[in-house]
Design a protein with these regions (language model features):
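Active-site microenvironment of metallo-dependent hydrolases
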Residues: 1-10, 16-37, 41-43, 105-109, ...
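Histidine-rich, glycine-flanked metal-binding segment
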Residues: 29-71
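Metal-associated gating/positioning segment near the N- to mid-region
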Residues: 69-140, 156-163, 225, 249, ...
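Active-site gating loops and adjacent loop-to-helix segments of metal-dependent hydrolytic enzymes
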Residues: 83-100, 109-112, 156-175, 210-223, ...
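Histidine/acidic-residue-rich catalytic or RNA/ligand-binding cores of hydrolases
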Residues: 86-89, 158, 212-214, 251-257, ...
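Divalent metal-dependent hydrolysis catalytic cores, especially in the metallo-beta-lactamase
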Residues: 104-129, 142-152, 199-212, 240, ...
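Alpha-helix-loop-beta-strand connector modules within alpha/beta enzyme cores
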Residues: 134, 138-152, 217-243, 284-288
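His/Asp/Glu-enriched, well-ordered alpha-helical/loop segment
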Residues: 236, 301, 305-306, 314-398
Length: 421
């Protein structure tokens, strides 16, 4: 009888609901912080109850977070898991896909420990992010929930053409399946390949880029017909479309086509902003990456010479563009371009958003509810509400008083499971 009783006690412990006490929490929806509450998380990993005051912890798996600020799990809409940008001196001449996969596992764990429970991987060398997403979902690795585009789409010589910088005899001419497309027909083939691969969305590089080996960082690289084809094909498969764009003309073509988000947006002009507002297009600014590359451009030989002037110009401009877009009313979702700068420093984006004019609460919502809306999952994630998936983090200090405390994530729960305490 004692043995049977012990088994029931053990099973009861395994199925215990979780109770969190918080003296201050930000729910991702309200315009103000709330105080003195009990959050109950059910065995299904969802928020079961949010009660005023403090429920007795008896019978619960209990976490006392009254010395911290509690928030919804954070979301970063622009990451590249699988390595970080290195100087010319440090950079290996070749990184095999297998090594990239190993680095991606490390980066995913680092990102989760920073409080980011959901990320959007936009651009991959192969199948790394798709495989990592599945491995995390199965439980083989620890990391954030991943939504990924797989390989980016580019035109010949464009920002994401993986044969750039190689002699013609050193590569096989890239096919649409590899991500290099020219004309609507090839666009359809590439989108369908992403569907076959198991991607969640599409990422296109509609203009030049900073780190690619080309002189221009902002020229348009997709025709209107090509961008229209991307969006039409993506909608057929239920994909979102994220667009790398620095130059205004390229991003305007993308916005008119009906894409979901503009990434970077460095040289966005007033017309582009008005189009984004009219079309409900999100802006994912990645100020952190701009600041990082501008800083590194001052170091001799850090970048190839063709990259250096582009890097020097982009940093200050992205911050200025972000501030103007926010004041104008463009919808903004949090994104860092982590992988250009080190993983685990995603929190710095909050500091830059504040620096360039966005209030703390708005910045926190940009990384919770607004990101969830961009992904189309705001009915499941993005806020602390009953029935939502229990992605919960806590920081030491109050980010509404000092946004830099977002670097001090002390507690991480994803789908009701505690990963950091």
């Amino acid at each position: 009888m004692k043995k049977i009783l012990s088994i029931f006690i053990f099973l009861g412990f395994l199925n215990a609901e979780t109770l969190i006490h918080t003296s201050i929490y930000i729910d991702g929806v309200s315009d103000f912080a709330k105080k003195n509450a009990s959050i109950v998380v059910g065995d299904d990993g969802k928020i079961k109850q949010i009660a005023n005051g403090y429920i007795s912890p008896d019978g619960y798996d209990y976490y006392d977070l009254r010395d911290y600020t509690v928030l919804p799990g954070l979301m970063d809409m622009h990451v590249h898991l699988g390595g970080e940008y290195q100087s010319k001196a440090e950079r290996p001449t070749k990184v095999e896909n297998e090594m990239e996969a190993i680095m991606a596992v490390k980066d995913a764990y680092t990102t989760l420990m920073g409080g980011f429970t959901t990320v959007r991987q936009v651009g991959d060398a192969g199948m790394t992010a798709i495989s990592l997403r599945d491995a995390i979902n199965i439980g083989y690795a620890k990391g954030p929930r991943i939504f990924t585009s797989g390989k980016s789409l580019a035109t010949t010589g464009g920002h994401a053409d993986h044969t750039n910088g190689k002699a013609q005899g050193d590569y096989v001419y890239p096919e649409p399946e590899s991500g290099v497309v020219n004309g609507p027909y090839e666009v359809y083939a590439a989108v369908r390949q992403r569907y076959k691969d198991g991607a969640d969305g599409i990422k296109i590089t509609v203009t030049g880029g900073v780190l690619s080996l080309a002189k221009s960082g902002d020229n348009p690289q997709f025709t209107q017909d090509e961008v229209d084809a991307v969006v039409t094909a993506a909608k057929d498969y239920g994909f979102w479309v994220a667009v790398h764009a620095h130059g205004a003309e390229g991003m305007k073509r993308a916005i008119k086509a009906g894409v979901d988000s503009i990434e970077h947006g460095t040289y966005m002009d007033d017309e582009a902003m008005e189009l984004m507002i009219a079309n409900g297009t999100y802006y994912v600014p990645t100020i952190s990456a701009g600041e990082f590359v501008a800083e590194k451009s001052e170091i001799d030989n850090f970048f190839p010479e063709v990259v250096r002037p582009k890097a020097a110009a982009v940093g200050p401009q992205i911050g200025s563009t972000f501030g103007k877009a926010y004041k104008k009313g463009v919808k903004i979702a949090f994104g860092t371009d982590a992988g250009v700068q080190p993983h685990g420093t995603n929190w710095k984006e909050f500091v830059y958003m504040k620096q360039y004019g966005m209030p703390e609460m708005t910045a926190l919502k940009a990384a919770t509810m607004e990101t969830a809306k961009l992904l189309g999952i705001s009915d499941k994630l993005g806020s602390l509400e009953v029935g939502k998936i229990a992605d919960i983090v806590a920081v030491k200090g109050n980010p509404l008083d000092d946004i830099s405390v977002m670097k001090d994530v002390m507690f991480v729960m994803k789908e009701g499971k505690v990963y950091k305490n």
